[in-house]
Amino acid sequence: MPPSRRELENIGVPPEWSSVVEVPSHDGATYSWHVLQRPGTSENAPVVLCLHGNPTWSFLWSRLFHELKSDVRIIAPDHLSMGYSQNTGPRSYETRVKDIEDLLRALSISEPIWIVAQDWGGALAMGYAVAHPN
């Protein structure tokens, strides 16, 4: 279940930035991800992917959404089993890196992207960067 309008307004996030995305997974399942997205001003806007750690979630990045220039598209997902994303149970490091690939594919995001990460989101960002050096 996604956050309520009131929860979003309490942290200064416009409700239209919050969505639930159905993501086909590399494991054959489809998972519901909660994602905060601020669109860029153009279709070709640079993309900043914000990966939280534990025990936080996408709301950690709400201030950054207001600080970065409006011509940047910002995406901050709740990892699976965290925040408002679907609870899938334990997931390995390798699986979580593939989960990020699945999400970006579902959002039609191509490289290059910038990644901002916190806590073990940094380890996931490194895993993604190793698999996608461009």
Description of each model-found segment:
Residues E111-N134:
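Conserved hydrolase catalytic core segment
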Residues Q37-Y84:
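Conserved HGGG/HGGXW glycine-rich cap/lid loop of the alpha/beta-hydrolase fold
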Residues S62, E101, M126-V130:
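Short, hydrophobic alpha-helix immediately C-terminal to the catalytic nucleophile
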Residues T56-L60, T95, A123:
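Short, conserved clusters of charged catalytic residues that mark active-site
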Residues F65-L68, R91-Y93, P133:
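Glycine-rich, phosphate-binding/catalytic loops in enzymes
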Residues W33-L36, E67, A123, A131:
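Soluble, non-transmembrane catalytic domains of enzymes that act on hydrophobic metabolites at membranes
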Residues V21, H26-A29, L36, A76-V116:
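Active-site loop/oxyanion-hole signature of alpha/beta-hydrolase fold enzymes
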Residues M1-V48, K69-V72, K98, I109-S110:
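Alpha/beta-hydrolase fold catalytic core
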